[in-house]
């Protein structure tokens, strides 16, 4: 049987992997977006774990809200990424440090 400790451990491992992805790869926007999505997934795992342990459905409702916000964030991020690639021909974060008026 899966206990609360197992689920919290899984959430912590996912969070650490996403944090490492953000700090180790700061050049590729796609990897940064994927790392942020993985971080939100680890938070969702923790919400589900505590919701299951306490017998309360509020954690599951928060998960649906977070998934909705994450989907909107991913769509906006990818739209910005496509626009960035069309104008600059790169998705490297280091080359996109200047604003154009």
From Swiss-Prot:
Keywords on record: Cell inner membrane, Cell membrane, Membrane, NAD, Quinone, Translocase, Transmembrane, Transmembrane helix, Transport, Ubiquinone
EC number: 7.1.1.-
Alphabetized GO MF terms: NADH:ubiquinone reductase (non-electrogenic) activity; quinone binding
Entry membrane topology: Multi-pass membrane protein
Taxonomic superkingdom: Bacteria
GO cellular component terms given for this protein: NADH dehydrogenase complex; plasma membrane
Entry keyword Cell inner membrane: yes
A single GO BP: ATP synthesis coupled electron transport
Subcellular location: Cell inner membrane
Pfam families: Oxidored_q2
Transmembrane residue ranges: 4-24, 30-50, 62-82
Catalytic activity: a quinone + NADH + 5 H(+)(in) = a quinol + NAD(+) + 4 H(+)(out)
Primary location class: membrane
Keyword Repeat: no
Quaternary structure and partners: NDH-1 is composed of 14 different subunits. Subunits NuoA, H, J, K, L, M, N constitute the membrane sector of the complex.
HAMAP family, sorted: NDH1_NuoK
Similarity-based family: Belongs to the complex I subunit 4L family.
Role this protein plays: NDH-1 shuttles electrons from NADH, via FMN and iron-sulfur (Fe-S) centers, to quinones in the respiratory chain. The immediate electron acceptor for the enzyme in this species is believed to be ubiquinone. Couples the redox reaction to proton translocation (for every two electrons transferred, four hydrogen ions are translocated across the cytoplasmic membrane), and thus conserves the redox energy in a proton gradient.
Protein name according to UniProt: NADH-quinone oxidoreductase subunit K
Gene (UniProt): nuoK
């Amino acid at each position: 049987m899966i206990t609360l400790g197992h689920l919290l451990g899984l959430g912590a491992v996912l969070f650490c992997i996403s944090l490492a992805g953000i700090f180790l790869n700061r050049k590729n926007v796609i990897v940064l977006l994927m790392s942020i999505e993985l971080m939100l997934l680890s938070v969702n795992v923790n919400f589900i774990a505590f919701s299951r342990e306490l017998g309360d459905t509020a954690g599951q409702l928060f998960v649906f809200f977070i998934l909705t916000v994450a989907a909107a964030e991913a769509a906006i991020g990818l739209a910005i990424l496509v626009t960035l690639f069309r104008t600059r021909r790169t998705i490297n974060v280091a080359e996109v440090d200047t604003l154009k008026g």
